[in-house]
């Protein structure tokens, strides 16, 4: 991922240095496991643990000759050791090291992403509670429907991200898995105890069955889950963008002193952060195809997935980490214009209370079709003449003979739409 959309904490996980360090840790743990089984002298393992070092530049230099990165790596590490170097990579095949180490690196990335998710969820919870009773216009098909609250909108986002966190924790169990089962997965030259020891010490699980590789359905599920998280954020970001439109202006991204919105128009204050999240989500989601196409490898192994994953996995995790942090700050610092929310409710002449009038007539004994046919023409007239809906209702004796003035007051009271907000918050775990 380009530096512009990267944070150092996550980017450092995907460096060659960290990748080689992960390979080395797998190699050393394998030696320790062999030693536990009595194959490698403990003194040799001690020397390997103390003296084996990674030199990325030297490994790449060797790779120019070997044309094989793992062979180059093991030879470079061996240069830092004495006679004990013969035990490095003992009984292993390249992907025993590469796939297991990759899962370990992904685990490191996941620990950051999980913290990101938890922080975002906390910010959403705080926003939901702050604006629990702040009435605003609910819109369906982009058109005014009935009042909701900004807190309910935030509660919706909160529960969606809670589901995303749950899914993320589940996919961690699938992706944080190692394998050290040899060239075709049969443990022909390495006992399962080695795999168990290494994976336990790395804090990852073991694959019940593998070939030379871990199966890439795991990685596809992982990328799809991260893409779903990104897409939820995009949905929220698009909502902010729509609510920041000049003619709506119910919320606005924080605008810093000295910030510029346009090179040509000094007045501009644009939702560029939310637009950024929208674009990054598209990039992340685009990798779903790559991840799925990596699943059908040939027989017990090919490396068609390798080049794709070297690009895909860093890009997706780095981009999602960046997006989660940026969007958390956007939501946390979001300006909410409560007066504009109320003014927008009043823009449609009270039409948003049409269902309340309809239900009141039904409750008084009128059949639904008759009630609907009485209310709808008044609503259409209100739209077309810009006349307050209640005024037109009160001019129709067939309605006022059924509904008293007090009953109409109740129909047109926006606070009615707050009646179940506490229930919604309790169900969301926000009470």
Swiss-Prot record:
PANTHER family: ADENYLOSUCCINATE LYASE. Belongs to the lyase 1 family. Adenylosuccinate lyase subfamily. It comes from Staphylococcus epidermidis (strain ATCC 35984 / DSM 28319 / BCRC 17069 / CCUG 31568 / BM 3577 / RP62A). Catalyzes two reactions in de novo purine nucleotide biosynthesis. Catalyzes the breakdown of 5-aminoimidazole- (N-succinylocarboxamide) ribotide (SAICAR or 2-[5-amino-1-(5-phospho-beta-D-ribosyl)imidazole-4-carboxamido]succinate) to 5-aminoimidazole-4-carboxamide ribotide (AICAR or 5-amino-1-(5-phospho-beta-D-ribosyl)imidazole-4-carboxamide) and fumarate, and of adenylosuccinate (ADS or N(6)-(1,2-dicarboxyethyl)-AMP) to adenosine monophosphate (AMP) and fumarate. It catalyses: N(6)-(1,2-dicarboxyethyl)-AMP = fumarate + AMP; (2S)-2-[5-amino-1-(5-phospho-beta-D-ribosyl)imidazole-4-carboxamido]succinate = 5-amino-1-(5-phospho-beta-D-ribosyl)imidazole-4-carboxamide + fumarate. It is an enzyme of class 4 (lyase). Its EC number is 4.3.2.2. Coiled coil: none annotated. Pathway: Purine metabolism; AMP biosynthesis via de novo pathway; AMP from IMP: step 2/2; Purine metabolism; IMP biosynthesis via de novo pathway; 5-amino-1-(5-phospho-D-ribosyl)imidazole-4-carboxamide from 5-amino-1-(5-phospho-D-ribosyl)imidazole-4-carboxylate: step 2/2. This is Adenylosuccinate lyase.
